[in-house]
Amino acid sequence: MAAEFAPHEAYATCSKSLQHEWKFVARVVPGAGEQMGQLEGIIRDRLIPVLMKGRRNGGPPTQYDVWLRDVTALPVRLLGLGIPKPTETADRDYKTSAAASEAITEAIFRGEDIDADEHVKTGQKARAAHKEAVKEAVEKEWERLGS
């Protein structure tokens, strides 16, 4: 694994590129979170241990592995690595994308002209709701990990 030789570069690649790729899939494919278990396993069992200079024994995840994965999913401002769990975030990402594109989708289905202002308003509202939902989820996880 490249992360063994260049952990910083592997982290940067994950946080700047790969996350955007799997988030795109999550936004456009309903139920994508169910299909991202293998990706989550690779992040938890291979990437995170290498970044933390730990080594996995290849067995099932230990309680420590699960805890470490939970911590690394936290935003950097809360001392995590900001590597979200694709299995847990995909459904929320899809719902936000569907809500943000609702006005334009409906106009296309009805064969009507697209109201750009309505599309922008719908998108802004969906993004604001998404941001609030993510904030609440992060705060809940922060409290759970702190107790």
What are the functions of these language-model segments?
Residues 1-147:
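Nucleic-acid-interacting cores, centered on viral/eukaryotic replication and modification enzymes
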